[in-house]
Amino acid sequence: MTLQEQIMKALHVQPVIDPKVEIRKRVDFLKDYVKKTGAKGFVLGISGGQDSTLAGRLAQLAVEEIRNEGGNATFIAVRLPYKVQKDEDDAQLALQFIQADQSTAFDIASTVDAFSNQYENLLGESLTDFNKGNVKARIRMVTQYAIGGQKGLLVIGTDHAAEAVTGFFTKFGDGGADLLPLTGLTKRQGRALLQELGADERLYLKMPTADLLDEKPGQADETELGITYDQLDDYLEGKAVPADVAEKIEKRYTVSEHKRQVPASMFDDWWK
């Protein structure tokens, strides 16, 4: 088995999918998991990007079906901007599409800035822009878990195969969640699910960005990665990609393995 095939298997990628079938499977997963855990529903941060839009709509469909079947579940969508988000219109469009039971907004700026100032005062140096970006992601995680803990809700994560293969998420930030309904999907497959669900094309054709950096606001994921999502998707779907691209992907996969595992102990062998 080639490394490409090993990665596809590890990340549960299917080269060809039926969007209707995938939607059904993922809604059922959300329903089954919330019932099994005894939780009261879900909470998810909504950025206005493709991934949170898709996960949010799946979550809302799941809780509606649970209620229609005589159960009780709620979905809360939470906006988590840092000051003014330049694509706020997209976030509002996403909320209109998702139609969450409840939605709220929590500006993380005062929390992030207070932490950054305290860090500088105590340690005598400023956080790098990259590290501050990770703090933003982790404050967002803390906020979602505060809401979830207060209301008995599970935190949904938006990680999918194209992020997982590169480790393109913040450890214990956007990587911190209770369940991952998008696991196994490539970026283009996620777009196909949104199309099937009737989303405005603006929500899945926009340039993907983590938007965590103050010095490079709105920087494209592809710029930061040095790899395009089409290349990642082709690789994950078992297609041929240029040798240098495959090498980049495989290197990122190897060095980011710790992000896809629980914290290492001396009894684990995945890190050896």
Swiss-Prot record:
EC number: 6.3.1.5
Residues annotated for deamido-NAD(+) binding in this entry: R138, K171, D178, H258, K259
GO-annotated molecular function: ATP binding; glutaminase activity; metal ion binding; NAD+ synthase (glutamine-hydrolyzing) activity; NAD+ synthase activity
GO term, biological process aspect, one: NAD biosynthetic process
GO annotations of cellular component type: cytoplasm
Classification via CDD domains: NAD_synthase
Catalytic activity: deamido-NAD(+) + NH4(+) + ATP = AMP + diphosphate + NAD(+) + H(+)
UniProt pathway annotation: Cofactor biosynthesis; NAD(+) biosynthesis; NAD(+) from deamido-NAD(+) (ammonia route): step 1/1
Top-level division of the source organism's lineage: Bacteria
Swiss-Prot/TrEMBL keywords: ATP-binding, Ligase, Magnesium, Metal-binding, NAD, Nucleotide-binding
Function field: Catalyzes the ATP-dependent amidation of deamido-NAD to form NAD. Uses ammonia as a nitrogen source.
Assembly notes: Homodimer.
Full protein name: NH(3)-dependent NAD(+) synthetase
Native organism: Bacillus cereus (strain G9842)
Chain's gene name: nadE
